[in-house]
Amino acid sequence: MEKYLNDAIIGNKNMLATFSSKGEMLRLSYPNHDNRQYLKYFHTGVKVNDSNIIYLHDDINNTYIQYYDTDTNILNTEITNTYFNLKIVQTDFVTIKEDILVKKYSFINDSNIEQDIKFLIHSELLSDQNNFISGMKLDNGMVQFAHDFSIA
């Protein structure tokens, strides 16, 4: 798959985010749609019990259904892992009045076995020698930042 083959787009007048058909966020533009890209990659995954990392956008046992809520720019990607009978509903949208990208994940255990599910994010911001980036963990969240922007 080419990196910039966009299957879904969400945004407002200042912010634009594009996604693959498997829910992978490919691009994020701000403060206008033609501005620079901020993400090198943004991958999410889970660990179920003692399993290896299951990347939500790329696992052989995952099936995908993607749709917009009716008459909105709210994008839903339903990811079902058939091995663990785990359904993940990923909801992505950009608020209309504020330039905020919201990513929400709901986990539904459809198996008869109790599962210990850990949610993981593996991401990297685009940078160069003059624009160093860093990150830090705060409570149950993560912030990545440079001198002129941050992603939390």
Predicted regions and their residues:
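Terminal accessory carbohydrate-recognition/targeting modules of carbohydrate-active enzymes
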Residues: 1-152
